[in-house]
Amino acid sequence: MAKLSLINRDIKRAKLADKYAAKRAELKAIIDDQSKTDEERYQARLKLQQLPRNANPTRQRNRCVVTGRPRGVFRKFGLTRHKLREMAMKGEIPGITKASW
């Protein structure tokens, strides 16, 4: 089990990213728009830099929903390889069977 402080930090980052997603998208659209003046684009870049660092979605870490482990997480299931295998062997994940050929 990962430390609760690290799990809570990632949850906090996810909430912050959701809160500022529209504002970030708006500013990035202005920055990428070639029809805007250089001054407008520069001001948009400064405003983007003023947003909280943790509002950037790339600072989030995929974690296992059961254990909070940050490595070896399968996106489709949200589980680490350990818990995925364990739950698949118990039959707790529908549609997953052990391979045999």
UniProtKB/Swiss-Prot annotation:
Keywords: Ribonucleoprotein, Ribosomal protein, RNA-binding, rRNA-binding. The keyword NAD does not apply. GO terms for molecular function: rRNA binding; structural constituent of ribosome. The keyword Ribonucleoprotein applies. Pfam families: Ribosomal_S14. SUPFAM superfamilies: Glucocorticoid receptor-like (DNA-binding domain). InterPro entries: Ribosomal_uS14 (IPR001209), Ribosomal_uS14_bac/plastid (IPR023036). GO terms for cellular component: cytoplasm; small ribosomal subunit. Gene3D superfamilies: 1.10.287.1480. GO terms for biological process: translation. Part of the 30S ribosomal subunit. Contacts proteins S3 and S10. PANTHER family: 30S RIBOSOMAL PROTEIN S14, SMALL RIBOSOMAL SUBUNIT PROTEIN US14M. Binds 16S rRNA, required for the assembly of 30S particles and may also be responsible for determining the conformation of the 16S rRNA at the A site. NCBIfam families: PRK08881.1. Belongs to the universal ribosomal protein uS14 family. This is Small ribosomal subunit protein uS14. The lineage of its organism: Bacteria, Pseudomonadati, Pseudomonadota, Betaproteobacteria, Burkholderiales. The gene is rpsN.
